Amino acid sequence: MTAHWISVRQLRQFGMLGMNCRNVDFINRYNRRSLYPLVDDKLKTKLLAQEYGVPMPGLQFVVREQHEISHIERQLVNSDSFVLKPSKGSGGKGILVVIGREGDDYIKSSGARIGVADIRRHMSNILAGLYSLGGASDVVIIEDLIA
């Protein structure tokens, strides 16, 4: 199989922006820097969007501290599918998509099976800042999976 590459010129003709162009010519130009904290935090963004009636996946619950992780089985008891993610993650890192459940196993979008201990570990890593910019502590967002 051979790869077919499109030139930068062709991408521009199709209206594609490079990251630098996007950031400098659009994001920086049309957005006040003082508002960045509202959109750099997925939980704040979600709550703000809901306040203005923007449709969003339902928020199941939020985990803010390590000790809360021990209670997740009760919170997930009726959840066969959900998305678990860091509030301040970047580039899609740290997102766990659960598409189903069989017995005590949760089924990831990849088809892999994980247990509640794996989910707890993932949450702990998020809280510790493993996926956030600069390694700052974070919160875990658990929301509805939309198909």
Stretches with model-predicted labels:
Residues M1-G18:
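Conserved oxyanion/phosphate-binding beta-strand-loop segments in alpha/beta enzyme cores
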